[in-house]
Amino acid sequence: MQGSVTEFLKPRLVDIEQVSSTHAKVTLEPLERGFGHTLGNALRRILLSSMPGCAVTEVEIDGVLHEYSTKEGVQEDILEILLNLKGLAVRVQGKDEVILTLNKSGIGPVTAADITHDGDVEIVKPQHVICHLTDENAAISMRIKVQRGRGYVPASARIHSEEDERPIGRLLVDACYSPVERIAYNVEAARVEQRTDLDKLVIEMETNGTIDPEEAIRRAATILAEQLEAFVDLRDVRQPEVKEEKPEFDPILLRPVDDLELTVRSANCLKAEAIHYIGDLVQRTEVELLKTPNLGKKSLTEIKDVLASRGLSLGMRLENWPPASIADE
């Protein structure tokens, strides 16, 4: 259904392809021409610079006074150990700061699994290597401070504020709080009916495992929306003198589900759930429909395909539904 030339298309499809637990592709379409880059660049910047997370900020290693030194029996120098600790993926519940301890002796690798912590802390990648001990008599003991923050804060930004109270041997670490390790977006061509000048936004991202990629996208979009809220009221400053009245709902939403010509099984399942109009159906989610007795994935796929052919989808939000014309029936 083609709207006015002055109206903006709203994305009707959000597809999330979970490549792995830390890697996902998110596709958003259709978008007006140019909006692919507008939204893609904004989300990319937020995901890289503004996502909250936890990171190592300070380390104390027994027998080490400064970062430009080495430790007997340890293969890596202290700078390399600090670099490895920066890659530690930690999830902390209910606290802004925790102290972790690590004690290891004997030949072999020292990994994140050797860190001692309480129940509020989860080491996401326990196989992450911190250093290697090269002697049977070698040992390493350290205390690791993990803090919650946002973005990237270099150690140099904290040196001057903490210089007076920082004891010798406490090593500051550049803190990269963002759980997003890689983010890239691509804008492809999309088509709706006769329009071929539309955008499709494809975002590919990887996280460190402390946050699900889908949740990261959701948080970034929320941050962007909250920042733009200050401008929302400005849109009502100018009101057109004459405004053509439009129907409150798309007429297709007011039609009965029988018009979708679903199979008898699918139609009966919907009626059993008191889903009589297409407007009732599009507000349901996939999860809700799968809970319907006798409605399986095959029927769900059929419903999604039929809705998509009409430019609709599940999970839509309809304000003031049902309309008075239906509610009175």
From Swiss-Prot:
One of its GO terms (molecular function) is protein dimerization activity. Residues 249-329 are annotated as: Alpha C-terminal domain (alpha-CTD). Its EC number is 2.7.7.6. GO terms for cellular component: cytoplasm; DNA-directed RNA polymerase complex. HAMAP family: RNApol_bact_RpoA. Homodimer. The RNAP catalytic core consists of 2 alpha, 1 beta, 1 beta' and 1 omega subunit. When a sigma factor is associated with the core the holoenzyme is formed, which can initiate transcription. This is DNA-directed RNA polymerase subunit alpha. It comes from Enterobacter sp. (strain 638).
